[in-house]
From Swiss-Prot:
Keywords: Cytoplasm, Stress response. Induction: Accumulates after heat shock. Belongs to the small heat shock protein (HSP20) family. GO terms for biological process: cellular response to hypoxia; response to heat. May form oligomeric structures. Binds to AKR2A. This is 17.4 kDa class I heat shock protein. It comes from Arabidopsis thaliana (Mouse-ear cress). PROSITE patterns: SHSP. Pfam families: HSP20 (PF00011). GO terms for cellular component: cytoplasm.
């Protein structure tokens, strides 16, 4: 059995195997009529990593969930001076022909997320780190210069 979801064969269910019985999904194939027989959840694979973007007084902080990936499999780039791009790829496993697969749910494939950074971003000082499947990207902000206020003595 292939590790790649079946796009033309529909579900992989064996009625004699209690571990392969799927629960009926009334929305299965709802978004992809006519394209394939594959459920929408199978073709989505690993297309998008979930990303949080928060702004602090000092920086823009991005956190991306990339479970199971090593830092060598993820790229963080700044394009065109203000586009933060986070991308990566999860490779598929080698399948053993002698194994009997009961369920294939983990996906493989590429993902890419792009964010337009605001003008106050210091793109030359971007830092990234990864821990426990969470990528953290910190983009420092340009410190706004506060207008200097000078008191003027009033004569008279």
């Amino acid at each position: 059995m292939s590790l790649v979801p079946s796009f033309f064969g529909g579900r992989r269910t064996n009625v004699f195997d209690p571990f392969s019985l799927d629960v009926w999904d009334p929305f299965e194939g709802f978004l992809t009529p006519g394209l394939t027989n594959a459920p929408a959840k199978d073709v989505a694979a690993f297309t998008n990593a979930k990303v949080d973007w928060r702004e602090t007084p000092e920086a823009h902080v991005f956190k991306a969930d990339v479970p199971g990936l090593k830092k060598e499999e993820v790229k963080v780039e700044v394009e065109d001076g203000n586009i933060l791009q986070i991308s990566g790829e999860r490779s598929s496993e080698n399948e053993e022909k002698s194994d009997t697969w009961h369920r294939v749910e983990r996906s493989s494939g590429k993902f890419m997320r792009r964010f337009r950074l605001p003008e106050n971003a210091k793109v030359e000082e971007v830092k990234a780190s990864m821990e426990n499947g969470v990528l953290s990207v910190t983009v420092p902000k340009v410190q706004e210069s506060k207008p200097e206020v000078k008191s003027v003595d009033i004569s008279g």
